[in-house]
Amino acid sequence: MKRPDYRTLQALDAVIRERGFERAAQKLCITQSAVSQRIKQLENMFGQPLLVRTVPPRPTEQGQKLLALLRQVELLEEEWLGDEQTGSTPLLLSLAVNADSLATWLLPALSAVLADSPIRLNLQVEDETRTQERLRRGEVVGAVSIQPQALPSCLVDQLGALDYLFVGSKAFADRYFPNGVTRAALLKAPAVAFDHLDDMHQAFLQQNFDLPPGSVPCHIVNSSEAFVQLARQGTTCCMIPHLQIEKELKSGELIDLTPGLYQRRMLYWHRFAPESRMMRNVTDALLAYGHKVLRQD
């Protein structure tokens, strides 16, 4: 049975994290040649490449499995070594989260854990349809995802749902929808997406107004908070979580343009098994807060 030296695994991890051999060497305080030798040693052990030498480098499927193993070992070490030793060096906790969860419920959910535990968060923001892939690749130890099925050697629990409303300012509605939200009017109304893979707005319009993808003008903005600002200032109509704009809806600063119509995204918490003590604390905090503020029906 092949048992990798975790020092060599850390070299592989550093190349991926630092996006190259030179910065990985600086991070590990060794030469670039030493980094290459350690990775070559791993590849010889497993008889196959562990890195695709692109810019930046990316792990092969076997490399992903080894990185996932390293993440589990790092967390389990925290539990076995005890508080006295781990308290001096905060544990790095890498999580993949969607921007809307980060902008609404995730940080309050983790506030007590962060206050009571020696943790350094590394939050990697990704669309909720793709966060699970980061867990699969071993880049993170936990992920908030819309995927209900657990990966091999992982655990999953339902958190609850975010309900997305189609909203805009009153001025925007008066300008683009003077006769209500119609198929013809939507073709001229500017929209916004998080990135080129974000299809929520398009899916909502296709489902409810039979508009094909790509038929409406759409800005690309990688910020959940910017969606709210764009809607408030009358620049676009947006799909925004109800949880994020409760005050704006109550004050009338934003209005629900299609009352009774919404998009629901059920969220799930994925992490490696077995869980370390620290990860159990994180899991308990996320589930408790998620069940409190997210839709459960």
From Swiss-Prot:
Keywords carried by this UniProt record: DNA-binding, Transcription, Transcription regulation
Xref: PROSITE patterns: HTH_LYSR
GO MF: DNA binding; DNA-binding transcription factor activity
InterPro entries xrefs: ArgP, ArgP_gammaproteobact, LTTR, LysR_subst-bd, Tscrpt_reg_HTH_LysR, WH-like_DNA-bd_sf, WH_DNA-bd_sf
Assembly and binders: Homodimer.
Described function: Controls the transcription of genes involved in arginine and lysine metabolism.
Protein name as it appears in the record: HTH-type transcriptional regulator ArgP
